[in-house]
Amino acid sequence: ALVLIAFAQVLQQCP
């Protein structure tokens, strides 16, 4: 589930 966490972080960075 590491990929999901990384993906969520990238989405959060977006405005």
Swiss-Prot record:
GO molecular function: metal ion binding; metallopeptidase activity; peptidase activator activity; toxin activity
Binding note for cofactor: Binds divalent metal cations.
Identification of the protein by name: Venom prothrombin activator
Miscellaneous remark of the record: The molecular weight was determined to be 72 kDa with an isoelectric point of 6.67.
Posttranslational modification: N-glycosylated.
Domain of life: Eukaryota
Example GO BP: proteolysis
A Gene Ontology term for the protein's cellular component: extracellular space
Cofactor dependency: a divalent metal cation
Subunit structure: Monomer.
Activity regulation: Inhibited by EDTA, but not by PMSF. Activity is not dependent on the presence of calcium ions, phospholipids or FXa inhibitor.
Keywords assigned: Blood coagulation cascade activating toxin, Glycoprotein, Hemostasis impairing toxin, Hydrolase, Metal-binding, Metalloprotease, Protease, Prothrombin activator, Toxin
Function, in words: Snake prothrombin activator that attacks the hemostatic system of prey. This protein is functionally similar to blood coagulation factor Xa. Potent calcium-independent prothrombin activator, possesses high hemorrhagic activity along with metalloproteinase activity. Has considerably stronger activity than FXa.
Tissue and organ distribution: Expressed by the venom gland.
